[in-house]
Swiss-Prot record:
The active site is at S518. GO terms for molecular function: 2 iron, 2 sulfur cluster binding; dihydroxy-acid dehydratase activity; magnesium ion binding. It comes from Azorhizobium caulinodans (strain ATCC 43989 / DSM 5975 / JCM 20966 / LMG 6465 / NBRC 14845 / NCIMB 13405 / ORS 571). This is Dihydroxy-acid dehydratase. NCBIfam families: ilvD (TIGR00110), PRK12448.1 (NF009103). Its cofactor is [2Fe-2S] cluster; Mg(2+). Its EC number is 4.2.1.9. InterPro entries: Dihydro-acid_dehy_C, DihydroxyA_deHydtase, DiOHA_6PGluconate_deHydtase_CS, ILV_EDD_C, ILV_EDD_N, IlvD/EDD_N. Binds 1 [2Fe-2S] cluster per subunit. This cluster acts as a Lewis acid cofactor. [2Fe-2S] cluster binds at C122, C195. The modification N6-carboxylysine is found at K124. One of its GO terms (cellular component) is cytosol.
Length: 617
């Protein structure tokens, strides 16, 4: 029987000093035999997805105490990728994932917490906490802050839903007036919550449902809706139950590594492919699997991408559909239900809230259940009032969207595409693979050949795209030395993709990079090229004007030069000595913190995780 971890610091004569300090936090005599639960919050006023979390940690804490536990809250950092976008702030986004994971480990292990509730929401916070949960392997429940309501603008053609990506594209389009840009800006992000489309934050919060570590509705019920409060209340009670099952009944089935098994990672990736989730999820799932010693790799993602169809399309892949619409159609449990009927997921796996995913689907899939509590829950609608307050409205749709032929969520027979929403491409400039969000690629450019336009920083590419005439239809914009090590930090390329759209080139150009893309990116955007240029990847050998062939149906990307020419270029690069595999004439200040990150990070094909073995070299 495993002993409660907390008793290391709460029991025994020699822990009198520690108990004295615990008492100073409010603990009483009767508390020292209870499980100590870490409430891992991520409140900050910098991030709209986290601005409403301030009081939610204490909401969970009160429920933990009602259930017989002792709750202790702490905070992690949280970076807003949208605000950090387009300048050197984006260098810090991906590295913050490791800082978050480490900070959770530090706090939980230093204070011997028995279990934890992870209150996350935005891009790197959910992945960082997920990595920590897999690393620590103590009972854990995830509950996110929830998606924001979609913005709405009234145009001459009628009302249109919008988000921050629409505002960015409009701002770079000379045909859009300053006043219309202001209207878009003021309407794009009306409430607290993670950005309203299927961007990275919402993708990851959906995947925690598929992994079995979060309650149904975690990925889709709006931050503003009163129904979301129930998730926080239930998480507080549930985590105490899980802790008791593990420490008092020796039930290891409640631990993250048992729940988030290899098959669960397959489920999560299958969901991601079926809903056209952010390409960043590939990085984060690989990293979380690595922490839990789960042998889930790019090869598994490639295998799944070849058989999983697209059953749900959400902004930015399609206009006017956002997370509030996915929720109305049954949320993540609705998509998983269709994947189950198609025989594409494993349902014999445990979750934190049900004995198996099969049991969860029987209760929560709106096409199977007639339970009024469930159908009412999925009718939770946007309130339409700008606010930064959680649970501030309780509006409901009159009915559900259960049309699986032409609704937001489709069944297998009526899939948007039989080919999945994400694909892994391989070739002579991406020997370890690269990722494209096929759900956001127009069918007319699934095969694309063009000349490479070389840029060794995102800034240089943006400057060229905005300079009318420098980038032409048919070009392939290639941005290198922006990978995990080369950036460092693997910047998101949201501005280049958005500006291509604003210049009318969204369906006429491709973008290839060893950096990554925002969940808000769409178009023929190929990222995570591995190995990256800074690690000797062949992307560093491409020359201006070289022809690149992209063939998504056949999962291929190819630089049209001979093997002999590739070898000649590699030898010439290696002959440069210390200047080899480095960008030319790029002026970028790299702090010591980022230098330390670059020294330890690995390829995107491995999730850009740290390789501590390098410390022993």
């Amino acid at each position: 029987m495993p002993a409660y971890r907390s008793r290391t610091s709460t029991h025994g004569r020699n822990m009198a000093g520690a108990r004295g300090l615990w008492r100073a936090t409010g603990m009483k005599d009767g508390d020292f035999g209870k499980p100590i639960i870490a409430v891992v919050n991520s409140f900050t006023q910098f991030v709209p997805g986290h601005v409403h979390l301030k009081d939610l940690g204490q909401l969970v804490a009160r429920e933990i105490e009602k259930a017989g536990g002792v709750a202790k809250e702490f905070n992690t950092i949280a970076v807003d990728d949208g605000i950090a976008m387009g300048h050197d702030g984006m260098l810090y986004s991906l590295p913050s994932r490791e800082i978050i994971a480490d900070s959770v480990e530090y706090m939980v292990n230093a204070h011997c917490a028995d279990a934890m509730v992870c209150i996350s929401n935005c891009d790197k916070i959910t992945p960082g906490m997920l990595m920590a949960a897999m690393r620590l392997n103590i009972p854990a429940v995830f509950v996110s802050g929830g998606p924001m309501e979609a913005g709405k603008v009234l145009l001459s053609t009628g009302e249109k839903k919008v988000d921050l990506i629409d505002a960015m594209i409009a701002a770079a389009d000379d045909r859009v007036s300053d006043e219309d840009v202001k209207v878009m800006e003021r309407s794009a992000c009306p409430t607290c919550g993670s950005c309203s489309g299927m961007f990275t934050a919402n993708s990851m919060n959906c995947l925690t449902e598929a992994l079995g570590l979060a309650l149904p509705g975690n990925g889709s019920v709006l931050a503003t809706h009163a129904d979301r409060e129930r998730l926080f209340v239930e998480a507080g009670h549930l985590v105490v139950d899980l802790a008791r099952r593990y420490y008092e009944q020796d039930d290891a089935g409640v631990l993250p590594r048992t729940i988030a098994s290899f098959k669960a990672f397959e489920n999560a990736m299958t969901l991601d492919i079926s809903m056209g989730g952010s390409t960043n999820t590939v990085l984060h799932l690989l990293a979380a699997a690595n922490e839990g010693e789960v042998p889930f790799t790019m090869a598994d993602i490639d295998r799944l991408s070849r058989k999983v169809p697209v059953l749900c399309k959400v902004a930015p892949a399609v206009a006017n559909i956002h997370m509030e619409d996915v929720h109305r159609a049954g949320g993540i449990m609705g998509i998983l239900g269709e994947l189950d009927r198609a025989g594409l997921i494993h349902t014999d796996l445990p979750t934190v809230h049900a004995p198996s995913m099969k049991d969860a689907l029987e209760r929560w899939d709106v096409t199977r259940t007639k339970a009024e509590s469930v159908t009412t829950f999925y009718r939770a609608a946007p309130g339409g009032v700008p606010t930064q307050v959680a649970f501030s409205q309780s509006r409901r749709w009159d009915d559900l969207d259960t049309d699986r032929a032409s609704g937001v969520i489709r069944d297998f027979e009526h899939a948007y595409s039989k080919d999945g929403g994400l694909a892994v491409l391989f070739g002579n400039i991406a020997e370890d693979g690269c990722i494209v969000k096929t759900a956001g690629v127009d069918a007319s450019i699934l095969k694309f050949t063009g000349p490479a336009r070389i840029f060794e920083s995102q800034d240089a590419a943006v400057e060229a795209i905005l300079a009318n005439g420098k980038i032409k239809a048919g070009d392939i914009v290639l941005i290198r030395y922006e990978g995990p090590r080369g950036g460092p930090g693997m910047q998101e390329m949201l501005y280049p993709t958005s500006y291509l759209k604003s210049k009318g080139l969204g369906k006429a150009c491709a973008l290839v990079t060893d950096g990554r893309f925002s969940g808000g990116s769409s178009g023929l955007s190929i990222g995570h090229v591995s190995p990256e240029a800074a690690e000797g990847g062949a992307i560093g050998l491409v020359e201006e004007g070289d022809t690149i062939e992209i063939d998504i149906p056949n999962r291929r990307i190819h630089l049209a030069i001979s093997d002999e020419e590739m070898a000649r270029r590699r030898a010439a690069m290696e002959a440069k000595g210390d200047a080899a595999w480095k960008p030319k004439d790029r002026q970028r200040v790299v702090s010591q913190a980022l230098q330390a990150y670059a020294a330890l990070t690995t390829s995107a094909a491995r999730g850009a995780v740290r390789d501590v073995k390098s410390l022993r070299r």
